[in-house]
Amino acid sequence: MKNSSNKYLDLPYRPGVGMMILNADNQIFVGKRIDTKISAWQMPQGGIVPGETPSIAAMREMLEEIGSNKGYIIAESKCWYSYDVPSFLIPKLWNGNFRGQKQRWFLIRFTGNNKDINIHTSNPEFDQWRWTSLDELLSIIIPFKRKLYQAVVKEFESLIQ
């Protein structure tokens, strides 16, 4: 979704990673964001620390957001995907320095158990979590990320077996 306010179009995208985390039943991890009153479900994502590779960032973010990094990378996206946040959110996120995010996405096989997942981390981003199907994923995602998620699903779909 493109930004409706031109004053933000010159801002860069924040470099980050996203993770499509699969359990043994090929269900996808989603968390409900803690910082909004609306039902905003998403897959884990986060920023890349300077000097960090995207794959290292993905595993670090997995640990930070779901309390476990038990898993392995199946695939990395072939390109960077980007999204713009709604203009009213820009001043509230990342000190207003970015218009959205550009992300490398990773398909990750979770090798732990549900009891290994702990979203009550030192800086929690989610207040609920669940496993969802590929079919349901796009219908529960916050709308401004839907186009990006469609592209990620299209790229990884054939690898989810």
Swiss-Prot record:
Pfam families tied to this protein: NUDIX
Chain span(s) of sequence motif Nudix box: 46-67
EC number(s) reported in the record: 3.6.1.-
Cited InterPro entries: NUDIX_hydrolase-like_dom_sf (IPR015797), NUDIX_hydrolase_CS (IPR020084), NUDIX_hydrolase_dom (IPR000086), RppH (IPR022927)
Segments forming domain Nudix hydrolase: 12-154
Keyword match Lyase: no
Name this polypeptide is given: RNA pyrophosphohydrolase
Highest rank taxon of the organism: Bacteria
Keyword Transmembrane applies: no
